[in-house]
Amino acid sequence: MREYLNNIKRSFKWKHFVNYIVVASVLVIFTVLYYAGALNRSLPSLLNQIGYSILLAVSLNLVVGFLGELSLGHAGFMCVGAYLGTYLANLFIAGGMPPMLALIISMLIGGLAAAVLGFVVGLPALRLRGDYLAIVTLAFGEIIRNICRNLPMFGGALGLGSSLNDAVNGKQIPPLFIVSLVLVLIMLVVVQNLLRSKHGRAITAIRDNEIASKATGINVTFYKLLVFIISAFFAGIAGVIYGSGVSPVLYTNFDYNYSIEILVMVVLGGMGSLNGSIVAATVITVLNFYLKSFLTGDMAAVKTLVYAIILIVMVIYKNAPALKNIREKYDIKKLVTKIIPHHKRESYVRDDEARWDVVTTKISMNEVLSTDIVVQESVTSPDKPDKPQSGSNE
């Protein structure tokens, strides 16, 4: 318990506090504007899309960026949460349950169902690597989508109507962007606490060198499954949020193209960067939203082309020298470092150096032990007879 509290305390240091401030500020500002009647009709929907897109991008970044495994079936977990959560919410509301309570229970069940499915799929799939794992996860996403399409309880090809969507329109529950942004805050606390713990260091060690991680005693299978389950859980919750904001829920919205779009958010923001995933998810969601608004009629067919061109330009100029100089000049961490007193900065440095000394000491001890084992084996093993030289007289 003490270690868990220490991990939470470390996760709230100044250099990790920016995410919470930004998300909480957006949540408070737009909530006040919404209840003041200062928001137009489309903005709450856009904010909700940004919220569940951040959930999807950060959760996939756990697998792709921090664990180092390529998954192309993330939309499948979202599909499970959307269909199951919407179906259960319809039953709960029809039985007289308050819509807000129905939403909370549906999110928990939808997330847990996606997590269980992540365990079932991940147990055999995560023994593969690279392209093979990508193909398996891609196939999984398509299988789940078609199963949901053919189940009569989910409405078949016509889709599943959402009572939660009716409750949102009737203002029986708060606007969904408030729920989704609160979930983003919860997810950031969980993910940053995980990554800054010993489990997070084990996960990044597996990404850097899986063979060396096994040699040092890290349970690689356990940590791969742990990351896969957590990622699937938040994707399932994002699916419930999505299903609550649309009616009907259609299987066509969870194809492999959407999985690729989530992966683009991760890659564009930087694999292994939580801040990057948040920014990229926001930019791509806003881009998609306004392209759908402006490109209507015959021009809707070129939306994908325009979207692809903009993404290519963004990827090319992301690493441009001019933009790198701007990012370095206005780096938030450097600006905050100037504000913090000098003695506090030194204490942070001393803490980091102390932790690094412990890590390097453990590594050096492992090297010494492995060297001792090799030397001992070479001493205790019997000498092998020399091979006779060719041409020597017997």
What does each of the following model-derived ranges do?
Residues 1-394:
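Transmembrane alpha-helices and adjacent helix-loop boundaries
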